[in-house]
Amino acid sequence: EFIARAYKLKDYKAYKDALLERFDLTDKKKKFGDELSKGMQQKLSICCGLLPRPRLVLFDEPMIGLDPHAIKELKKVFEELRDSGCMVLVSTHMIDSMEELWDTTYIMKQGRVAAVVERENLKDNHKSLEDIFFEITEGAALEREV
């Protein structure tokens, strides 16, 4: 309710209920955040971030604390957001978790962007995102585009 009021949302209740059901939080509707486990708090934060139907959304380590079912569901959400035209930015150390989802990645090294990698430029390159990350961070020059 707080998020809906903060964003002055109208007709949000069905979407709110769908988000809570999608992330298995329906039975937790009456609980306060501090009564939830870390994983449930993470899922609730994701639901709160999605409620205003943003055109751009930033997720910081979104899979930390989530159970495998919730991770699978969150990946579906990422795909749906992308397909709807929403820009999805994900900051993560769990590189393999984003392997099938990324279009553009910014690889950081010592607090700076070391490389910008476009998936479409790698069609003939069979390296994984993790391989590319280690190739760039283990000795490559800063600020190059792949």
Predicted feature descriptions by range:
Residues V57-E61:
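Catalytic Walker B motif of ABC-type/P-loop ATPase nucleotide-binding domains
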Residues R53:
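Conserved catalytic motifs of ABC-family nucleotide-binding domains
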Residues K72-S84:
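Helical segment within the ABC ATPase nucleotide-binding domain
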Residues F32-L36:
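Conserved ABC ATPase signature
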Residues I46:
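Hydrophobic anchor residue at the start of the ABC signature
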Residues E1-K28:
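Conserved ABC ATPase "signature" region
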